[in-house]
Amino acid sequence: MSKNKLSKGQQRRVNANHQRRLKTSKEKPDYDDNLFGEPDEGIVISRFGMHADVESADGDVHRCNIRRTIRSLVTGDRVVWRPGKLAAEGVNVKGIVEAVHERTSVLTRPDFYDGVKPIAANIDQIVIVSAILPELSLNIIDRYLVACETLQIEPIIVLNKIDLLDDEGMAFVNEQMDIYRNIGYRVLMVSSHTQDGLKPLEEALTGRISIFAGQSGVGKSSLLNALLGLQKEILTNDVSDNSGLGQHTTTAARLYHFPHGGDVIDSPGVREFGLWHLEPEQITQGFVEFHDYLGLCKYRDCKHDTDPGCAIREAVDEGKIAETRFENYHRILESMAQVKTRKNFSDTDD
């Protein structure tokens, strides 16, 4: 999904070079090999510029340079690295990342200027955090779910701040969340303030690498602090009592370990997933309850709106597909078209 797609032959050569490094780590170096120790396995816990922090098997963190032959390196990558030795002047030499293991998954986001950019690697699940304050937005949840389905990374929906609900409000929110439970998504109701519901969430995170996604103000950082036992400093986006707006903060993507087991990558790049780079067919596939009806419409070019003989529209009318989800599907398509129009207009100005 890179901006300049490699040919099959080029990709084979890149993969072959990486495999040689993984096996031997003895190709011609861009650093003096005498400065480094034996190759070891590690995981990237943060990346900045041409340096990365790599955690070794014993839990120590090492600042490393990155070989120029490595095309892409992000937080969560599993790597072969070598520790730096003590230089003659008594100065410790940084370690070096020699090669990157094949990724099981990669989280990406679109960028107007750089194409699709990787954010994190080897993610097992995306935790979609929403809240009743400043507003429970099913449209935002649906956007995240489309991104998860497109990336083929399992989502979990977490509704935070349930301590602010009375019985009537809880019943309404549960009715809204049943829309997602009924199509196979896992939904957890929690409060980072009272810590209600944290135990099931801890169990869902154990033994997996997760990334939390959510708009400013939903309590994502407060929730992470509660799960981490306040052992780490993750900036909190508090909600103003007057405006209801979250305070914007930015940090580098970093991997943390939960005390109960499992890891989380905290990244500012997943506040909101852009979908404008996707094709309409990918958005349609991102709504899992549509799958049984695709190909059953009267016309092959059906837009799944007011077209006669639309199987998806009929399923909505019969109550088999939630009308809210159907409406959000079209809102997403409309927003994509608007963004692409603005992008094309901007491109013509350059």
Curated annotation (Swiss-Prot):
What is a GO molecular function of this protein? GTP binding
Cofactor notes: Binds 1 zinc ion per subunit.
What PROSITE patterns does the record tag this protein with?
A: ENGC_GTPASE, G_CP
Query: Mind naming one GO cellular-component term on file for this protein?
Result: cytoplasm
Give the keywords, sorted: Cytoplasm, GTP-binding, Hydrolase, Metal-binding, Nucleotide-binding, Ribosome biogenesis, RNA-binding, rRNA-binding, Zinc
Some GO term, biological process aspect, for this entry: which one?
ribosomal small subunit biogenesis
Q: What is its main location?
A: cytoplasm
Assembly and partners are described as:
Monomer. Associates with 30S ribosomal subunit, binds 16S rRNA.
Q: Keyword Magnesium: yes or no? A: no
Q: What is this protein called?
A: Small ribosomal subunit biogenesis GTPase RsgA
Where does the UniProt annotation locate this protein?
Cytoplasm
Name all CP-type G domain ranges. 104-273
Q: Which residues bind Zn(2+)?
A: C297, C302, H304, C310
Is the keyword Cell membrane assigned to this protein? Answer: no
Q: Where does GTP bind?
A: N160, K161, I162, D163, G214, Q215, S216, G217, V218, G219, K220, S221, S222
Species: Escherichia fergusonii (strain ATCC 35469 / DSM 13698 / CCUG 18766 / IAM 14443 / JCM 21226 / LMG 7866 / NBRC 102419 / NCTC 12128 / CDC 0568-73)
This protein's cofactor list reads:
Zn(2+)
- Quote the PANTHER family the UniProt record gives: SMALL RIBOSOMAL SUBUNIT BIOGENESIS GTPASE RSGA, SMALL RIBOSOMAL SUBUNIT BIOGENESIS GTPASE RSGA 1, MITOCHONDRIAL-RELATED
For this protein, the record's CDD domains field holds: YjeQ_EngC
Give the start-end ranges of region Disordered. 1-33
Give residue spans, biased composition: Polar residues: 1-17
Q: What class of enzyme is it?
A: hydrolase
- Taxonomically, what lineage is the organism? Bacteria, Pseudomonadati, Pseudomonadota, Gammaproteobacteria, Enterobacterales
The function of this protein is: One of several proteins that assist in the late maturation steps of the functional core of the 30S ribosomal subunit. Helps release RbfA from mature subunits. May play a role in the assembly of ribosomal proteins into the subunit. Circularly permuted GTPase that catalyzes slow GTP hydrolysis, GTPase activity is stimulated by the 30S ribosomal subunit.
- What family does this belong to? Belongs to the TRAFAC class YlqF/YawG GTPase family. RsgA subfamily.
